UniProtKB/Swiss-Prot annotation:
GO terms for biological process: isoprenoid biosynthetic process. It catalyses: (2E,6E)-farnesyl diphosphate = (+)-aristolochene + diphosphate. This is Aristolochene synthase prx2. Mg(2+) 1 binds at residue 115. Mg(2+) 3 binds at residues 244, 248, 252. Homodimer. Pathway: Sesquiterpene biosynthesis; aristolochene biosynthesis; aristolochene from farnesyl diphosphate: step 1/1. It comes from Penicillium rubens (strain ATCC 28089 / DSM 1075 / NRRL 1951 / Wisconsin 54-1255) (Penicillium chrysogenum).
Length: 342
């Protein structure tokens, strides 16, 4: 198999004629920071953790997508590499089993890439695009091997089911909920923060991240145990969504002015709260940062209650709750460093 460096070099050849890559300076010289660096987040009591195989898995997964995804230009290749999708997955799931982390990296990477495609589509076209991918993911329909999004998803889900059918199938429906939320017309009419957070729980893919974490860690819970985690997961979804929105706002605001009026429509907690409260964008971000730290405190309180409860708390449940904490702290670390937002 070619090394990642060899793959990048070979990919660059078809694009050397493109104006935007001729004599272009290194990436670090072309990146213009979008985020307001004068806004300092309040201190957190948490620390992030990254999966120990991050470098190895990132090279493997990035190499796979460089060979199979149809990037339109070498600039798009550099943007993809700068986003570090496998790194965020390893930050989301640092406790994943060594032989499962690559599955999670592949799934989140292809979903990020599909999200970028949808940004340039109408809701109707995006819905049709996703509806084609859903039965392929289930294994009910064979993929068109000329379309990377189809065969990548098909092969990935088949390999996940071969590894652990029960837990892989538990990830399916949450993935579809996430995909449907991407083209939900409700995002055009959200003007209240509470309504937004309810919608965003689907759009941020919280159920997907939770199910994928259980798959990656090999955790099995009864229906009652899963139900008992709902409040913790809902709280986690709010924190994840808002941290993501704070860091991605400037990039998404820019995209809303240049992209498709529906696919790139700006739907963000920053925008919603700014309009609702009549605060400026920097002030709104500061308010939202305070809210994220309060949700972290709520998480710690719920965890402490569960551990101290008379019914006790299994080691699997403790690992899962710690995993949710790492999702939040890992998401913040990635969001403030990825070139996707900065």
């Amino acid at each position: 198999m070619a090394t990642l460096t060899e793959t990048i070099t070979s990919l660059a050849q078809p694009f050397v004629h493109l104006e935007d890559t001729i004599n272009s300076p290194p990436v670090k010289e072309t990146i213009r920071p979008r985020n307001d660096t004068t806004i300092t987040p309040p201190p957190t009591q948490w620390s992030y953790l990254c999966h120990p195989r991050v470098k190895e898995v990132q090279d493997e997964v990035d190499g796979y997508f460089l060979e199979n995804w149809k990037f339109p230009s070498f600039k798009a290749v550099r943007t993809f590499l700068g986003a570090k999708f496998s790194e965020v997955t390893c930050l989301y799931f640092p406790l994943a089993l060594d032989d499962r982390i690559h599955f999670a990296c592949r799934l989140l990477t292809v979903l990020f890439l599909i999200d970028d495609v949808l940004e340039h589509m109408s809701f109707a076209d995006g819905e049709a695009y996703n509806n084609r991918l859903i039965p392929i993911s289930r294994g009910d329909v064979l993929p068109d091997r000329t379309k990377p999004e189809e065969f990548i998803l098909y092969d990935l889900w088949e390999s996940m089911r071969a590894h652990d059918a029960e837990l892989a199938n538990e990830v399916l429906e949450p993935t579809f909920v996430f995909m449907r939320a991407q083209t939900d017309r409700a995002r055009l009419t959200i003007h209240e923060l509470g309504h937004y957070l309810e919608y965003r729980e689907k759009d941020v893919g919280k159920a997907l991240l939770s199910a994928l974490m259980r798959f990656s860690m090999g955790l099995r819970f009864s229906a009652d145990e899963l139900q008992g985690m709902k409040a913790l997961e809902a709280n986690c979804a709010k924190q994840l969504s808002v941290v993501n929105d704070i860091y991605s706002y400037d990039k998404e605001e820019e995209a809303s002015r240049t992209g498709h009026k529906e696919g790139a429509f700006l739907c963000s907690a920053v925008k919603v709260l700014a309009e609702e409260s009549k605060l400026g964008i920097p002030a709104t971000k500061r308010v939202l940062w305070s809210m994220t730290r309060e949700w972290e405190t709520v998480h710690d309180e719920i965890v402490a209650e569960k551990i101290a409860s008379p019914d006790g708390c299994s080691e699997a449940a403790k690992a899962y709750m710690k995993g949710l904490e790492y999702q939040m702290s890992g998401n913040e670390q990635w969001s403030k460093t990825t070139r996707r937002y900065n």
